[in-house]
C-alpha cells in the first residue's frame, strides 16, 4: 500500500514529530543532556516507523517536499539578515582560519575514503561515494556527482552517494550537540563568552527589540529578500557553478540589512526575523527527517559501512582535537565544533540545528552563527566541487 501525503499533510506530520521531539526532550534527561535537536528526535522515530512499514510491506510513504524547500529558504534568509558588516569585520581572521580548516577537512575526507577503499579492494571511485561528496556536500552534491561517477562505470553510484548522505545527516545531527556540550563543560567555557562579537549582538538586540505588531513587517522583509534573491541566484547560475537555492536570498538579505543600517532608510526587525528563522529551521528539519529513507542504508555492504564509520570517526577527531584548538579553545570554538559536525557530515541546516540545541542550553554564539552558514553555504560547496573534481580526475 502506498500512502501519498500532499504538502499540507507533510507539514502537519513534521509539526507532530517536532512536538513529539520537544516532549521527549523535556521528559528524557539523556536527550536534554546531550543537546539532541528536537526535530531529530521525533523525526528519527517517525523515520524508523516508516522504514519498518516499508520493509514488512505494510505501507510505503511518499511526501511532498515543496514546503520543506520554502522553510529552508526562509531560514537562510533570516541568517543573511544577521550579516552585520561590523560583526563580519571583527571576525575576518576567524573566517579565513575556519575556511582553511574546512578545506583541510574536505581533503582528509577524500583521502580517508580513497585510502580505505584501496585497503578493502574496492574501486577508489566507490570510496569517493563516501567522501566529501555526501559528507560536506550532502544530498545536493550527492545527486550532482552520483551520475558523474556512474558515467565512469561505478554502478549505483547515485544510490550509494545518497545513502551515505543520509547516514551522514543522521550521525551529524547526533554527535554535534554532545561534542559541543562536552567541550563547554570540560573546559568551563561559559566564562569565555564575553567578546566583541557578543557585545555587538547585545547592542543589536537593544536596537531591534521584539514587538508583536512588527512580525508582519518581518515576514514582508523576509519575502522581499527572497524575491530579490531569485535575481541574484539567476546571475550566479550563469557562472556555470552550482549554488544552493538559498544563496541568492542570503545575499539579498545581507545587502538589505547593511543598506538599512548605514542609511537609516528602514528598520530591519531582527528580533522578529530571528524568531521566524528559528521556526522555519525547526519545520525544515522536521520535514527533512520524516522523509529519510532508512532502508537505503540497509542495502549498503559491510565495506561501505566501514567507510562511513571512518568518516564519522574522522569528523569527531578533526573537530574535537584540531578545530577546537585552532579556533581558540573558547565557547565560540565549542559551538563551531557542534556546527561543523552538522555540515561536515550532513548539511548546513543540521549544523544550525546542532548549534541552536547547544546555545538554547547555554548562551548564543554570534561568531558561530555567522561563520557556519557563511562558509557552509557559500564557500564549502564551491571548494568541495573543485576538490572532488581534482580527485576524480586524479583517480
Where are these regions (language model features)?
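Juxtamembrane and boundary regions of transmembrane helices in multi-pass small-molecule transporters
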Residues: 115-122, 165-202, 318-331, 376-395
Amino acid at each position: 500500500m502506498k500512502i501519498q501525503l500532499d504538502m499540507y499533510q507533510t507539514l502537519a506530520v513534521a509539526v507532530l514529530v517536532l512536538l513529539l521531539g520537544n516532549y521527549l526532550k523535556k521528559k528524557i534527561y539523556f536527550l536534554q543532556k546531550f543537546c539532541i535537536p528536537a526535530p531529530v528526535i521525533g523525526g528519527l522515530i517517525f523515520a524508523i516507523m516508516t522504514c519498518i512499514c516499508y520493509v514488512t510491506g505494510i505501507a510505503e510513504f511518499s511526501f511532498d517536499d515543496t514546503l520543506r524547500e520554502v522553510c529552508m529558504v526562509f531560514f537562510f534568509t533570516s541568517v543573511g539578515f544577521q550579516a552585520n558588516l561590523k560583526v563580519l569585520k571583527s571576525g575576518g581572521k576567524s573566517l579565513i582560519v575556519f575556511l582553511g580548516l574546512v578545506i583541510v577537512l574536505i581533503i582528509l575526507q577524500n583521502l580517508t575514503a580513497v585510502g580505505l577503499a584501496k585497503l578493502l579492494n574496492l574501486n577508489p571511485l566507490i570510496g569517493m561515494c563516501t567522501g566529501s561528496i555526501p559528507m560536506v556536500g550532502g544530498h545536493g552534491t550527492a545527486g550532482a556527482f552520483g551520475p558523474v561517477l556512474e558515467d565512469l562505470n561505478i554502478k549505483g553510484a547515485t544510490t550509494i552517494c545518497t545513502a551515505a548522505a543520509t547516514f551522514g545527516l543522521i550521525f551529524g545531527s547526533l554527535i554535534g550537540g554532545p561534542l559541543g556540550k562536552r567541550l563547554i563543560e570540560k573546559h568551563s567555557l561559559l566564562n569565555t563568552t564575553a567578546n566583541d562579537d557578543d557585545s555587538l549582538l547585545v547592542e543589536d538586540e537593544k536596537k531591534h527589540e521584539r514587538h508583536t505588531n512588527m512580525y508582519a513587517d518581518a515576514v514582508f522583509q523576509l519575502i522581499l529578500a527572497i524575491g530579490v534573491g531569485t535575481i541574484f541566484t539567476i546571475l550566479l547560475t550563469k557562472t556555470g557553478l552550482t549554488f544552493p537555492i538559498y544563496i541568492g536570498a542570503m545575499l539579498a538579505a545581507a545587502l538589505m540589512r547593511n543598506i538599512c543600517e548605514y542609511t537609516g532608510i528602514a528598520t530591519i526587525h531582527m528580533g522578529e526575523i530571528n524568531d521566524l528563522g528559528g521556526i522555519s529551521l525547526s519545520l525544515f528539519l522536521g520535514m527533512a527527517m520524516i522523509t529519510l529513507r532508512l532502508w537505503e542504508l540497509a542495502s549498503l555492504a559491510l565495506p561501505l559501512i566501514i567507510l562511513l564509520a571512518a568518516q564519522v570517526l574522522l569528523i569527531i577527531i578533526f573537530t574535537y582535537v584540531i578545530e577546537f584548538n585552532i579556533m581558540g579553545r573558547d565557547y565560540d570554538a565549542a559551538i563551531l565544533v557542534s556546527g561543523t559536525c552538522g555540515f561536515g557530515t550532513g548539511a548546513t541546516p543540521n549544523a544550525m540545528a546542532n548549534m541552536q540545541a547547544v546555545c538554547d542550553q547555554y548562551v548564543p554564539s554570534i561568531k558561530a552563527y555567522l561563520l557556519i552558514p557563511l562558509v557552509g553555504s557559500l564557500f564549502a560547496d564551491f571548494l568541495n566541487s573543485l576538490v572532488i573534481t581534482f580527485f576524480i580526475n586524479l583517480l
